């Protein structure tokens, strides 16, 4: 069996955590909780986490499915260089963003999810993984001479391949697919 790429799981967990933080922050702010400012903080932290985590990283083996519109955010994430590429930094950033939101009931679920994502990122960093962008593959242009095949010699409709006569069978005296002669006499008497 192959190695588990932990960063892929951490990315999904952190993105979901960001969305949960935003939702909890909206509930806390709109509900005018006692510490509503922590709800506003959770909205900002959730947006930051979502922007950081939306671009998927390239897998070391196999292919990676790019998210819709990811290429635009990938450029932004690439600008920060080692700050976003290193999973140790991401793990501690997520853990630091999660702590203040943990003091409010509406955002505690997002805090727990983000703390779990932080732990998974720490595991990925210990295993030596790092974020690398998904680069678009250059499209290979088909060579013009290589794709043209011999045109068919029979006009349509053509018989199936197994029904076509082969020149070697015809020369060998193999009977063709014409009518056969019945060795038994047939009477057409109707009673």
Curated annotation (Swiss-Prot):
It is a multi-pass membrane protein. One of its GO terms (molecular function) is heme binding. It comes from Bos taurus. This is Cytochrome b-245 light chain. The gene is CYBA. It is found in: Cell membrane. Subunit of NADPH oxidase complexes that is required for the NADPH oxidase activity that generates, in various cell types, superoxide from molecular oxygen utilizing NADPH as an electron donor. Subunit of the phagocyte NADPH oxidase complex that mediates the transfer of electrons from cytosolic NADPH to O2 to produce the superoxide anion (O2(-)). In the activated complex, electrons are first transferred from NADPH to flavin adenine dinucleotide (FAD) and subsequently transferred via two heme molecules to molecular oxygen, producing superoxide through an outer-sphere reaction. Residues 134-191 are annotated as: Disordered. Belongs to the p22phox family. The keyword Oxidoreductase applies. Its main location: membrane. Phosphorylation at Thr-147 enhances NADPH oxidase activity by promoting NCF1/p47-phox binding. Residues 2-7, 54-69, 81-86, 127-191 are cytoplasmic. The modification Phosphothreonine is found at residue 147. The keyword Zinc does not apply. InterPro entries: Cyt_b558_asu. Residues 70-80 dip into the membrane without crossing it. Keywords: Cell membrane, Electron transport, Heme, Iron, Isopeptide bond, Membrane, Metal-binding, NADP, Oxidoreductase, Phosphoprotein, Transmembrane, Transmembrane helix, Transport, Ubl conjugation. The modification Phosphoserine is found at residue 168.
